[in-house]
């Protein structure tokens, strides 16, 4: 569950590609009416052998805060079922400095999973940081899971970003495309709450 079409590829595309036999659903909360990005997202879903859906929450440049309950309602509206083996979404600080929608989607998914309104055996949060804009986003050093992508998998992911989504090879998005993917991983609410508190985040 991501904020924007391309987030799924940028932050977890290698993982999806390496588990293409899984029954993937990819949802994005923004850009359903974007005549450029929406059809590209549909093509990426085909390349990833995934199902998916889009909604059209506000994503204007002002990045006005969205009511937390509204974001949660949209997440539930988009999800196709009641139970999932693994749920992937943004990290609590986003993946770079900084995008409000990434944080809001994380907060919504975490709140729903913690409350039992989304059932999933495991919750994985993207684990990337950019040193407060000191460098391109990269895997957090002590993330629970870090996986260096085989060259051919990374190339496929890079091609999705540049040839399907259409980002220039020298764009921020293309240069960011991680060769190592990383996640914070939780199998219980207790694990998540402990980790959340240790980082000074509001539970």
PLM regions: where:
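Active-site rim/loop-helix segments in enzyme catalytic domains that contact anionic ligands
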Residues: 1-83, 110-120
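Divalent metal-coordination and catalytic microenvironments
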Residues: 6, 41, 87, 101, ...
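Active-site environment of divalent metal-dependent phosphoester hydrolases
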Residues: 7-10, 33-36, 92-98, 131-133
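Short aromatic-enriched loop/helix-cap "lid" or pocket-rim segments at secondary-structure transitions
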Residues: 12-13, 37-39, 100-101, 134-140
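Internal, well-ordered alpha-helical segments in soluble enzyme and binding-protein domains
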Residues: 37, 71, 104-109, 153, ...
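Short catalytic/ligand-binding loop motif for oxyanion handling, primarily in non-cytosolic enzymes
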Residues: 61-63, 95-99, 106, 132-135
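Active-site adenylate/phosphate-handling loop in enzymes that bind or generate adenylated species
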Residues: 80-124
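The feature marks non-catalytic terminal segments
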Residues: 86, 119-203
